[in-house]
Amino acid sequence: MAPPAVLSKSGVIYGKDVKDLFDYAQEKGFAIPAINVTSSSTVVAALEAARDNKAPIILQTSQGGAAYFAGKGVDNKDQAASIAGSIAAAHYIRAIAPTYGIPVVLHTDHCAKKLLPWFDGMLKADEEFFAKTGTPLFSSHMLDLSEETDDENIATCAKYFERMAKMGQWLEMEIGITGGEEDGVNNEHVEKDALYTSPETVFAVYESLHKISPNFSIAAAFGNVHGVYKPGNVQLRPEILGDHQVYAKKQIGTDAKHPLYLVFHGGSGSTQEEFNTAIKNGVVKVNLDTDCQYAYLTGIRDYVTNKIEYLKAPVGNPEGADKPNKKYFDPRVWVREGEKTMSKRIAEALDIFHTKGQL
C-alpha cells in the first residue's frame, strides 16, 4: 500500500483522511496514541512529541477535561462548561496544529448516556461549522453506552451516527465493559468475566453501523481497566481481538485481513507484548491518559523540589537576600517542565506503538 496523501497533511484531518490513516496503520502495523488534553499546555506537549517523532497523533477531550478547559469557575449545569470547553479546545487545536506540520485527529472521549447533552452540544457545533466550511469541527467522537444493554447501546450509536455520517465524521463506540473509572463511567466493581466482549456482540455493532458508513471503530473489551494497577491485577487478553476479526471476516465473506477498526482503552501501564498483540489484531488507536497525567506532574514536581529555596518568596534566595526569584516562579518556566516530561512519555508511546517515523 502506497503511503496515503494524509501523511503529508498538517493540522486537523477528517472524513476520508481519517479512514486512510487508520487503513495505513493496519497495513503497516502501528497504532496512534490518543492523548487526553485539558489545556493549551497539554495540547502543545502532545503536538511537540508527535512532530519531533514524525508521527500522527490523536488529541481528545473528555467531558471533565473539557469542563476544565473552559475553567473550573464555569457552572457545568446541563453540560454547559463541557460543551464550551470542548468547542474552545477544538478551535484552539485547529488554529495551532498546522504549525506543527503533522496530521491530527481531533476526537472526544467517553460519553455515557447521562452525558449525552454534552454530545448533543458538540454535534450541534459540528453541524454549524460544517454548514459554513464543509467540514465538521471535530474529526470524530466517542459514545460509551457500555453501561446500557447491547441493543440500546447499538441503537443509540446508530441514531447519532446517521447525523455524523452526513458530515463524514468518524464514530468510536464501546461495547462490553472497560473496568475502572473514566469521566462519568464507573465500572470498578464489575465481575472480571464481564470485561471480555464476544465476537458475536462485536459483529452486531458492525452489522448495524456499516450500513450507515464505514467510518467507525469499536472499543471492544478484552480485560481493559482504566488507570494504572499493580502487575497481575489486570488480565488483558488482546489475542481475543483476533477472534473478532476472524469471526467478522467469515460473516462478511471478505479477504480483508482486518475488517474491523479496533481501539485499545486503558493503555496506561500495559506491556510491549500486549500492545504488539493488539496492534497485530487490528487496533489502530490506543488511549493514553493516566501515564501522561503522571508524567506531566513529575516535571513540575521535580522542578519545585530542586528550586524550592528560590520559590519561597518573590525576593531572597541562597544567592542573596536581595536577589529576585521571578525567573524561577514564572509559570512559563515550571509549566514548561511538565510539558517536557509529558512529551517524553508520549514519545515513548510513539515508539512502543510503532508510530514513530511513519510520516
UniProtKB/Swiss-Prot annotation:
The cofactor binding remark recorded in the entry reads: Binds 2 Zn(2+) ions per subunit. One is catalytic and the other provides a structural contribution.
Give disulfide pairs as residue numbers.
Answer: none
Q: Does the keyword Lyase apply?
A: yes
**Organism listed in the record:** Candida albicans (strain SC5314 / ATCC MYA-2876) (Yeast)
Q: How does it assemble?
A: Homodimer.
Q: InterPro entries from the entry?
A: Aldolase_TIM, FBA_II, Fruct_bisP_bact
CDD domains named in the record: FBP_aldolase_IIA
Molecular functions per Gene Ontology: fructose-bisphosphate aldolase activity; zinc ion binding
Cofactor section: Zn(2+)
The cellular location(s) given in this protein's UniProt record come to: Cytoplasm
UniProt protein name: Fructose-bisphosphate aldolase
Biochemical pathway:
Carbohydrate degradation; glycolysis; D-glyceraldehyde 3-phosphate and glycerone phosphate from D-glucose: step 4/4
Q: Binding residues for Zn(2+) 1, per the UniProt record? A: H110, H226, H265
